[in-house]
Amino acid sequence: ALPRPVLAIDEWWPVNEWQDIGGRQLKVLHAPGHTRDSMILYDAERAQLFTGDFIYPGPLFAYLPGSDLDDYRNTTIELLDLINSESILLTAHRSKAPGAPLLRRHDLEDLLLTLKEIKSGTRKGKGVFPVTYKVNDEIDLLTDISW
């Protein structure tokens, strides 16, 4: 068997600070919801968000230890306040080839509407555990039994 690689962390990037990565400025955003410690990188110059597991085409897991729908909603509101209609969300978990999975502002708007309707009880999900809520044609939100 091959030895496991060791990845050393030299520095933790502080939240809400800009990091220069080879002449490109990225702001580190705390993005709880999927997990308590989720983060997103924001490139204001290119109007891009690197969202990781916070939002992507496919099933969003919001039933993990540390997942929180209130946090998901609040982070989604903050992201919508930050970006414009031209912004691109570069996400994780490519389900369709080729290229990086991309979403747009309207996908965050759809997620926010879904979260609000789950909270108010007007959006009905399918299943018991996880409960699946249709966000749009590309995204489902999977939650535990209660908000």
Segments (PLM) and residue ranges:
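Accessory terminal helices/loops
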Residues: 77-147
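Catalytic core of the metallo-beta-lactamase
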Residues: 4-81
